[in-house]
Every structure is written in C-alpha cells, then in structure tokens.
Amino acid sequence: MATESCLSSSQISKVDNEKLVRPKVQLKSLLEDAGADKDVFTMKEVMFYLGKYIMSKELYDKQQQHIVHCGEDPLGAVLGVKSFSVKEPRALFALINRNLVTVKNPESQSTFSEPRSQSEPDRGPGDTDSDSRSSTSQQQRRRRRSSDPESSSAEDESRERRKRHKSDSFSLTFDDSLSWCVIGGLHRERGNSESSDANSNSDVGISRSEGSEESEDSDSDSDNFSVEFEVESINSDAYSENDVDSVPGENEIYEVTIFAEDEDSFDEDTEITEADYWKCPKCDQFNPPLPRHCKSCWTVRADWLPETHSNWENLSRNTRTNPEDTSVTTTPNTTFEKKLSKPSSPLPETDDGVDVPTPPLLRRGSSQEETPELERFNSLEACLPATCLEPCVICQSRPKNGCIVHGRTGHLMACYTCAKKLKNRNKLCPVCREPIQSVVLTYMS
C-alpha cells in the first residue's frame, strides 16, 4: 500500500475537514520532514503528513502498533506527551489542534472545494428539493413520528444502520512494510449512492436526506472519531443483526464427565497376589479370592465353605459306637415303651397349635439325642484358645463372632454388632489401629 494513498478521508467532520489551518513553527518543521511543501493545510493533509512522519520515524510500538512513543522525539515536545494511542482520536485531535491556527481565506476554500465538487456526481433534482425543504424537515419528522409510528421505527432502523456503516468504516491498518497510516472509510461513496437513489423517488429522498442530516448532526463526534483495526472494502457485506448471534456470549457452560467405577475393585489391593486367585472350572477364568462367584459365568467357587454334613455324620457315628450310650439305648425297658405308646395321662393340644410341655421321660430322651452336640462343643473348647470363648470386649455380653478384616488379616475380638458399629463410624481396628475394610460374621465349627 502506497504511503500517499493511506489517507483517503479524514476522521474529522466535514466542517473541520474543509477548514484551512496554518501549523505552528515546530509542527510545520515536522510536517516538512514528512514531505509537506506549503504553509496552509487542511486537516486531512495535516493528519496525512503526521501519519507519514510517524511511519518514517517508526515511533509506533512493534507489539501494540496503535501506541505511538514520542517521548524522545520532537513530536513529543510539540504535542506535550510522551506517548498516545490512535484509539483515542478525540485526545489526539485536541493535541494537534493546539499547534494549529485557523486561516480564513475564501479563495483557498473555493479552490479546495473545486476538486471535491468534481469528484462528486452531479446533484439531481431530488437533492435540490431536499435542500430547499431542509428548514421544515424537523417539523415534518415530528408529524410523521406522531402519525405513523411504524414509519418512524423504520427510519430509526435505517438511521442506526447508517451509523454502523460509518462507524465501521474508519480503521487503522498496517501493510507488509509496517506503514503507519489512518485509513478513512466509505462515508462519501455511501452518501453519494444514497443521493442517487433519492432521484428515483422524491419522498424517499427527502426522508433519507433528513435522516442523514440528523445522524451527522447528532453523531458527528462519535462516528468521525471511531477507530478499528481492519480495513473494509466497498464489496464488504453490510452489517446485519444476525451477526450478533454468531458472537459467543460471556457466559459459557462446560460439561465435565467423570468416569469412575461404581463398585470397589480387588485388583488394586497390593496384598493380593496372582497366586491367591482361583480358577473357575467351567470358563477357566481367574477370579479374586474374596468373591465367591466367577465374574464371567457366575459359578460358585468349589470348596468355598467346609462340608458340615460330613462332620455331623462322623459325630453321630461316634456317638452310636459309644458303649455307654448303647447301654442306655439298647436296654430293654417295656415300661418305657408302654409309656411312650400309651401315656398314663394324655396331654391335650391347644387350638393355636402350641404343644403342651413334654413329660420328664420325653425330656430324658431328647437330652440323650443332644449329647453329640455337647461333646462337639467340648471338643471346640479343647482346641480353640481361651480368648475366643470369652465374650465381646466392647459389650461384654455377646460372643466374639465379628471378625474385623483389614487386608489379608483380621482380628476376632468383638461381636458382629459392635464390629459393624466400628466400621460404620469409620473407626480403626482396636487391636492394630488399621483401617477396617470389612466385618465378617464368623461361625466356629
């Protein structure tokens, strides 16, 4: 992009753009360094040569190119600041205006307005009529607004659309050579296109000219001093309200999914090795030692519990072979059999199905049948340690049948109820102070 074509239209209003000014001595020397060769300038030319000077001196920041550092340059002494930003055009215009003197020369104004009038197309009769009725435009607008609210809303939308076109048209850009320049917009071309459209319909032309005049009067400062960082061309798409939907909102919702297992896994237990796993006889699947079922086919593990029936059979056989018991059972007693078959005083049975207490002879026979269980309990007392036969150390009432398991070991020192309470309250094992993994109801056989 050539430096001479950097400034196509000033960011200043029309009146200030056509106003002739004379820079002071210090500012004039800076403009002459940028290539200026005259004494009187327009504001457009002052901005052009000032941008050319900043480009040649490379006073702009390499990272943030809209910031100009002029503290060690004569430009800083002229403007009275060490740095400024082109994003604040009002402040920049105020700094430059201090070093300018207004020149009132109608001849020079006419010479300046001639090329501008040549560059613009001929004005049609619609524009002439709109200029003649400009004095009564405000009254007509008020009447239209009061009579037709829909047309007033349409005018407001078109006026706001023109505001966006003008405010979006000014931008600051840097080409491949990092040239610093201010690019004007398409306000003049769009104004000409609107005036050419007004020739076809005089009423529409009047309303458009009135809307443009009102927007220029009310928004001259905000529109003419807006700065952006992209260059728009004539063929660029117009602003549409649908583009607002594409802009992401401030509030964004993030959905986070956490994957975790619902059940505890035995694979993480460091105390369980592969040697402890058991193999299913049906599907040949290796399973952890604690579950009793296979994970694949749900088959119960063989030898999961001891065979209690065989023990009972062995104990019953031992009691039958005992000579003392056989003497009791084989002794012929006809009177005992008669009393069993024909009791002397038959006992009735209640309607509720509750049996009447048995006579002493029947109790004697049942006690003879319970003798194997007593012998079995006596054998357990002989083989188990004395601490296992003591009551629970916590409640001192129930037997010790609640094994506190932690890892591959456990302690049998409390009943199942007390041990379960310790587990639910997240207490430690009272013996070894280890975390309680589970509580097992223990049967002594």
From Swiss-Prot:
Bias type Low complexity, positions: 193-209
Comp. bias regions, Acidic residues: 212-222
Region (ARF-binding): 190-279
Biased composition (Basic and acidic residues): 117-132
PROSITE patterns linked: SWIB_MDM2, ZF_RANBP2_1, ZF_RANBP2_2, ZF_RING_2
InterPro entries: Mdm2, MDM2_mRING-HC-C2H2C4, p53_neg-reg_MDM_2/4, SWIB_MDM2_dom_sf, SWIB_MDM2_domain, Znf_RanBP2, Znf_RanBP2_sf, Znf_RING
Zn finger (RING-type) start-end: 392-433
Top enzyme class: transferase
Primary localization: nucleus
Entry EC number(s): 2.3.2.27
Pfam families for the chain: SWIB (PF02201), zf-C3HC4_3 (PF13920)
Zinc finger (RanBP2-type) stretch: 274-303
Catalyzed reactions per annotation: S-ubiquitinyl-[E2 ubiquitin-conjugating enzyme]-L-cysteine + [acceptor protein]-L-lysine = [E2 ubiquitin-conjugating enzyme]-L-cysteine + N(6)-ubiquitinyl-[acceptor protein]-L-lysine
Function (record text): E3 ubiquitin-protein ligase that mediates ubiquitination of p53/TP53, leading to its degradation by the proteasome.
Protein name per its UniProtKB record: E3 ubiquitin-protein ligase Mdm2
Species this chain originates from: Danio rerio (Zebrafish)
